[in-house]
Amino acid sequence: MPNTKSAKKRVRVSEKRRLRNKAYKTFFKNRIKEVIKAIENGEPKEVVLELARKAQAAIDKAVSKGVIHKNQGARRKERLFKRVNEYLKSLEAAETTQE
C-alpha cells in the first residue's frame, strides 16, 4: 500500500487511466472484429467499407489518446485493409466471372 499522499494519488490516477485505456482498446478491437465478421458473412461492398472506415477512425483515436503506439496503429490498419482489399478483389472477380 502507498504511504505518501502523492503515491496514493498515483494509484488512483493509474487505475482511472487503466480503465479508460481498456475501454478504448476494447472499442477498436470490436470494430475490427465487426469488419472481419462482415467479410466472412459476405456482406456487400458498401457495408464492409463503412465498417472499415469506422474501425480506422477507432484505431486512430486510440493512437491519438496514447492507448497504443502509432506504429501498432499503422500495422493494425494495414492488416485490416489488406483483408478488406482482398475481399473486394474477390467480389470483383466473382462479378466478372458471372458476366
From Swiss-Prot:
Q: Per UniProt, what is one GO molecular function of this protein?
A: small ribosomal subunit rRNA binding
This protein's GO CC annotations: cytosol; small ribosomal subunit
Keywords of the record, alphabetical order, are: Ribonucleoprotein, Ribosomal protein, RNA-binding, rRNA-binding
- Domain of life, per UniProt, equals Bacteria
User: Which terms under GO biological process does the entry name?
Assistant: translation
- State the similarity comment: Belongs to the bacterial ribosomal protein bS20 family.
**PANTHER family in the cross-refs:** 30S RIBOSOMAL PROTEIN S20 (PTHR33398), SMALL RIBOSOMAL SUBUNIT PROTEIN BS20C (PTHR33398:SF1)
Q: What does this protein do?
A: Binds directly to 16S ribosomal RNA.
Full protein name? Small ribosomal subunit protein bS20
This protein's species is Thermotoga neapolitana (strain ATCC 49049 / DSM 4359 / NBRC 107923 / NS-E)
